[in-house]
Amino acid sequence: WPGASEFAQRYQTKFGKKPTYHAACSYASMMLLGETAAKTGNDRKKLRDALASQSWTGIMGDVKFENYDGFTQQNKHEMAVIQYQNGASVVVYPPSRAKAKAVYPFPGWK
């Protein structure tokens, strides 16, 4: 996703380790909130309405808040499935992001 590699490199340089899922999620959340607040100013209703009606693409993928299955204002998005193949982690799902087909059934550990 746009900016993900750059974020990981900057994080590695600053902290001396790879970013965790939580670090990336926190960064993405604050970037989204910061961009939206910069456009809406201090008006809470405008901020809320903008968050509820817009969509973004960032280091964690696409973000669009919506209501579904009894939940409100959730970011319903496809989850990436990673599989180790020949010693490397590879995205195998969703099809739009897959770099290889999933190996199934599991061939076992070597």
What are these regions (language model features)?
Residues 1-110:
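Extracytosolic ligand-binding ectodomains
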